[in-house]
């Protein structure tokens, strides 16, 4: 192939501009990203060589080499991994549709620390080289191809790049950065070693640099020909826990997760028995941008006997714990394990169950800690990941009780952080149920008319506003013997909390209101399944409820927003016979208008939308004149 000049994908040009102008204060990350890419390339070779050992050619020892040239003002990161063909170079470096560039660009915040973290998460770390370089040259040959099939790629990171054939004896890839003016600090072995130590010390491959000795005559260090390893080059998780410091655990997390925020907690265990494996699992402090994508790439890397197998080992962690990051290294799985085999393996099932228990144990330790700081950490975790953890209540029957104890809610007595155990401890004498209401927002829930009698009697009600709540509650019926009861479903029955005088008064009011009630039922027969007198209202004239077996208006709206069809069932209108508006109904010449407005206001009060807002406005106008 003769030299070709090709144009970058438009989004890549935008990305390059942002990288060079937005991440300057975090410029050290370029070395982390390029070493990480080199390590990945070696992992891929090791994996492909399981089925074709000839890919190793004459070099089975995998390594990453970092070098610099003061005269030429270049830094080179080279690996002897899988390498790339000419087509792969063009696809991977010129167009990066697979890397989610558009989404990456949309997520850039202008905060340099956050943006530096994102660049690795979105798989566009190669381009971080342009933070310090005004030109990058890549030379590569894919393992298994002839020496004549090497390729050179070069670009100044502007609008286009050049590609040409190259005779390259060694497989793998070298990335050479031609430094910008003012970046000479990186032309130093001490500087490069310090960056490698900070970000890449736990890369499981050796990272080599040329040795240096002090030259007394020149009063400077002189580079030697011999190469020496500058990182620990050992899998952190395989080392004894007693030899690993907290700082090393956190450094490893930052290196493999591309997350600069320290994790909330981690657990490191060697499991022996029916299945033997090592697990090193972390709870991140911040939710990823695609947390709600259940098909998102997971955070668990699978190794078998220290050999990297796959990045996204979803079968090793349930979907509701998809935010967990870490490494699982099995001694039992075959090296050629496939994703399909992972779904069926008994060993994988044992690893999944064991890992789930470890993660829940970390959460329980934080949530139940006597240390207020640890409990605050759990509160922070819940704000980031609580809604996803709720999925487990319906998906993980074996751990449902443990998950129920970890749930946290807002309530009429607290803005957040109320556990079901907290609620039970505050229940009124004679209270027989745990009461809750679902709504789109906490404010809407807090001001819902269905809460009025509960507020009057000082009964706490949980305020549920996550989209997953209704689904979760279809699987969680009780907690420690107390049923969970929606205040917007069925007839209100406060049992022993309602005295006999109140009950008799309500029955008498209902009897006196019967003629008006029948007329209301007839007027609203197309909109309401029933109309009845209620004791749940104190200040509001009316509210909507549904039968115990029907879906709530809130859930019906969520299904509609998701483009799904909801079962059609009419709500029940409950009226407060003590309210002036309801009293006006009796004998009113505008009965129909009043009845319809009463229903419309109840719809609005529960967060619903009117089918015909114009008709509502016309009725209100007629009643006002």
UniProtKB/Swiss-Prot annotation:
GO cellular component: cytoplasm
Family matches, as Pfam families: HATPase_c_3 (PF13589), HSP90 (PF00183)
Localization: Cytoplasm
GO molecular function: ATP binding; ATP hydrolysis activity; ATP-dependent protein folding chaperone; unfolded protein binding
Chief location of this protein within or outside the cell: cytoplasm
Segments of this protein annotated with the region A: 1-339
InterPro entries: HATPase_C_sf, Heat_shock_protein_90_CS, HSP90_C, Hsp90_fam, Hsp90_N, Ribosomal_Su5_D2-typ_SF
Organism domain of life: Bacteria
Keyword line: ATP-binding, Chaperone, Cytoplasm, Nucleotide-binding, Stress response
Annotated region (C), positions in chain: 558-625
Residue ranges, annotated region (B): 340-557
Keyword ATP-binding among record annotations: yes
HAMAP family associated with the record: HSP90 (MF_00505)
Stated family: Belongs to the heat shock protein 90 family.
Matching PANTHER family: HEAT SHOCK PROTEIN 90 FAMILY MEMBER (PTHR11528)
Physiological role: Molecular chaperone. Has ATPase activity.
UniProt subunit comment: Homodimer.
Name the record gives this protein: Chaperone protein HtpG
């Amino acid at each position: 192939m003769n030299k070709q000049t090709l144009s970058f994908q438009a989004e890549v040009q935008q990305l390059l501009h942002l990288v060079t102008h937005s991440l300057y204060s975090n410029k050290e990350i370029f070395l982390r990203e390029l070493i990480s890419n080199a390590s990945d390339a070696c992992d891929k070779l090791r994996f492909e060589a399981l089925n074709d050992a000839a890919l190793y050619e004459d070099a089975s020892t995998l390594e990453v080499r970092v070098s610099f040239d003061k005269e030429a003002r270049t830094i080179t990161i080279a690996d002897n991994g899988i390498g790339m063909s000419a087509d792969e170079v063009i696809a991977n470096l010129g167009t990066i549709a697979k890397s989610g560039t558009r989404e990456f660009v949309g997520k850039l915040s202008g905060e340099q620390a956050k943006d530096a973290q994102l660049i690795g998460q979105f798989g566009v770390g190669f381009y971080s080289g342009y933070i310090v370089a005004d030109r990058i040259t890549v030379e590569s040959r894919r393992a298994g191809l002839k020496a004549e099939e090497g390729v050179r790629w070069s670009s100044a990171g502007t609008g286009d790049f050049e590609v040409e054939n190259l005779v390259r004896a060694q497989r793998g890839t070298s990335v050479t950065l031609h430094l910008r003016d003012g970046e000479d600090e990186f032309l130093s072995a001490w500087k490069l070693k310090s960056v490698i130590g900070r970000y890449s010390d736990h890369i499981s491959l050796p990272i080599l640099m040329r040795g240096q000795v002090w030259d007394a005559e020149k009063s400077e260090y002189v580079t030697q020909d011999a190469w020496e390893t500058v990182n620990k080059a050992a899998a952190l998780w395989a080392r004894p826990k007693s030899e690993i410091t907290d700082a090393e655990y956190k450094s490893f997390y930052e290196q493999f997760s591309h997350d600069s925020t320290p994790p909330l907690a981690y657990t490191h265990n060697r499991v022996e028995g029916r299945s033997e494996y090592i697990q090193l699992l972390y709870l991140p402090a911040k939710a990823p941008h695609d947390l709600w994508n259940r098909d998102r790439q997971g955070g668990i890397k699978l190794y078998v006997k220290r050999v990297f197998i796959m990045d996204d080992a979803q079968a090793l962690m349930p979907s509701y714990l998809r935010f967990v990051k870490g490494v699982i290294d099995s001694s039992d799985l075959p090296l050629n394990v496939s994703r399909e085999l992972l779904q069926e393996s008994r060993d994988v099932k044992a690893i999944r169950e064991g890992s789930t228990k470890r993660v829940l144990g970390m959460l329980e330790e934080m949530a139940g800690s006597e240390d207020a700081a640890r409990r605050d950490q759990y509160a922070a975790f819940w704000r980031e990941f609580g809604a996803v953890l709720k999925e487990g209540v319906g998906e993980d029957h074996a751990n449902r009780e443990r998950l129920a104890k970890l749930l946290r809610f807002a309530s009429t007595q607290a803005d957040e952080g109320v556990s079901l155990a907290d609620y039970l401890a505050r229940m009124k004498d004679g209270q027989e149920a745990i009461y809750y209401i679902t709504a789109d927002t906490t404010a809407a829930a807090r001001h819902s008319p269905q809460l009025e009698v509960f507020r009057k009697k000082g009964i706490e009600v949980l305020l549920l506003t996550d989209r997953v709540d209704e689904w979760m509650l279809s699987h969680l019926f009780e907690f420690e013997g107390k049923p969970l009861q929606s205040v917007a479903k069925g007839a209100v029955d406060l049992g022993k909390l309602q005295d006999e005088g109140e009950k008799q008064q309500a029955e008498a009011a209902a009897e006196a209101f019967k003629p008006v009630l029948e007329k209301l039922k007839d007027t609203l027969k197309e909109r309401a399944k029933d109309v009845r007198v209620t004791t749940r209202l104190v200040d509001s004239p009316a509210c909507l409820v549904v039968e115990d077996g029907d879906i709530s208006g809130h859930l019906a709206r969520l299904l509609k927003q998701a483009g799904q069809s909801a079962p059609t069932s009419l709500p029940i209108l409950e009226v407060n016979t003590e309210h002036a508006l309801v009293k006006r109904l009796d004998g009113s010449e505008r009965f129909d208008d009043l009845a319809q407005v009463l229903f419309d206001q109840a719809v609005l009060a529960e967060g619903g939308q009117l089918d015909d807002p114009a008709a509502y406005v016309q009725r209100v106008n007629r009643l006002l004149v």
